[in-house]
């Protein structure tokens, strides 16, 4: 899946996460995480983001995660929504989600 535009999903409210995804000039996933629980859960957040992007077939993107203590299911949903928006996909492949 190719990222065509910058897109975001989520809010900066408590227990939520804002995910921004856009096209990258360099190959690979460029990931920046800012989280109130980064010291405890930073590695887990990174793993969830990378797994979710891999499931969607995203190989090249700039990703910024601004986490306010979101649950894993919320993080996964926000990453999916932002990636689909950035790819400008209108036809969802539900089996990938």
Swiss-Prot record:
Gene, per the UniProt record: citD
Modified residues (O-(phosphoribosyl dephospho-coenzyme A)serine): 14
Protein name, as recorded: Citrate lyase acyl carrier protein
Keywords tagged on the record: Cytoplasm, Phosphoprotein
Role this protein plays: Covalent carrier of the coenzyme of citrate lyase.
Cellular compartment(s): Cytoplasm
Pfam families: ACP (PF06857)
Gene Ontology cellular component annotations, sorted alphabetically: cytoplasm
Protein family membership: Belongs to the CitD family.
Disulfide bonds: none
Phosphoprotein in keyword set: yes
Origin: domain of life: Bacteria
Major localization class: cytoplasm
Quaternary assembly: Oligomer with a subunit composition of (alpha,beta,gamma)6.
């Amino acid at each position: 899946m190719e990222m065509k535009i910058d897109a975001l999903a989520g809010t900066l409210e408590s227990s939520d996460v804002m995910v921004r995804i856009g096209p990258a000039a360099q190959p690979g996933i460029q990931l920046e995480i800012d989280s109130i629980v980064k010291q405890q859960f930073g590695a887990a957040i990174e793993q969830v983001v990378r797994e979710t992007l891999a499931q969607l077939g995203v190989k090249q993107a700039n990703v910024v995660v601004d986490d306010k203590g979101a649950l894993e299911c919320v993080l996964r949903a926000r990453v999916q929504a932002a990636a689909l928006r950035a790819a400008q996909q209108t036809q969802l492949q539900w089996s990938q989600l």
